[in-house]
A protein has these predicted regions:
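Juxtamembrane/interface motifs at transmembrane-helix termini
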Residues: 37-38, 55-58, 111-112
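Arg/Lys-rich, positively charged N-terminal/basic patches that mediate binding to nucleic acids
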Residues: 1-41
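Solvent-exposed, flexible loop/coil residues
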Residues: 12, 60-63, 99
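Basic/aromatic recognition patch in beta-strand/loop cores that engages polyanionic ligands
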Residues: 44, 48-88
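Conserved protein kinase catalytic domain
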Residues: 22, 43-46, 95
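Enriched for short, Lys/Arg-rich terminal
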Residues: 73-77, 81-113
């Protein structure tokens, strides 16, 4: 029996989150190596969802009819949906833990409609 593998795609919002965080790291901490590697690290975390992406918790909110899942990774939270028909995971947001992520996601969803 072969394991189903999913393709990872990034919504514009998740790409903007990663870009904004990378810029923050570079400007605030002047930690060039971590800042330059931030996107790579987050993409590696997302790549782990290629197998069994539904193994993480749902947050109780929907995006375009799909359940939103949350994957904690280090000090970040990855929010994504799973389209089983196309075998695709779509990364929606990448947020720092400790933020009011529920408010951020709800506000973002209102603007996405």
């Amino acid at each position: 029996m072969s394991t189903k593998r999913y393709k990872i795609e990034y919504a514009k919002s998740s790409r903007e989150d990663m870009k904004r965080t990378k810029k923050y790291i570079l400007n605030t901490f002047k930690y060039r190596e971590y800042g330059e590697n931030f996107t790579k690290i987050m993409r590696q975390a997302a790549d782990s969802l290629k197998v069994l992406p539904t193994g993480f918790d749902k947050i109780g909110l929907l995006y375009r009819g799909y359940d939103i899942y949350i994957k904690p990774y280090r000090t970040y939270l990855l929010f994504y949906i799973v389209n089983s028909e196309t075998n695709t995971v779509i990364m929606l947001r990448v947020l720092k833990d400790g933020t009011d992520w529920e408010h951020i996601i709800r506000t973002w969803l209102k603007h996405e409609k």
